[in-house]
UniProtKB/Swiss-Prot annotation:
Belongs to the acyl carrier protein (ACP) family. Pathway: Lipid metabolism; fatty acid biosynthesis. PROSITE patterns: CARRIER, PHOSPHOPANTETHEINE. Keywords: Cytoplasm, Fatty acid biosynthesis, Fatty acid metabolism, Lipid biosynthesis, Lipid metabolism, Phosphopantetheine, Phosphoprotein. It comes from Geobacter sulfurreducens (strain ATCC 51573 / DSM 12127 / PCA). One of its GO terms (cellular component) is cytosol. It comes from the Bacteria. This is Acyl carrier protein.
Length: 77
């Protein structure tokens, strides 16, 4: 597991209040991890802060699961 993948999973678990074991690469933030739209906004903000990147609203809408977040951050850091 890459350091980006590990950190993304830690942030997702922390932001959504779920156990890290539930945070699999294909876990959907809303469907599998119980996030609502506010949770996803806060999650994107936490990822931006952690990785010092800016995620546009358009791109944020495309980040639906853990792997999407990992891929986006890997491409933009």
């Amino acid at each position: 597991m890459s350091s980006i993948e590990k950190r993304v999973k830690e942030i997702v678990a922390e932001q959504l209040g779920v156990d890290e074991a539930q945070v699999t690469n294909d876990a959907s933030f809303m469907d599998d991890l119980g996030a609502d739209s506010l949770d996803t906004v806060e999650l994107v903000m936490a990822l931006e802060e952690e990785f010092d990147i800016e995620i546009s609203d358009e791109d944020a809408e495309k980040i639906q699961n853990v792997q999407d977040a990992i891929d986006y951050i890997t491409e933009h850091t």
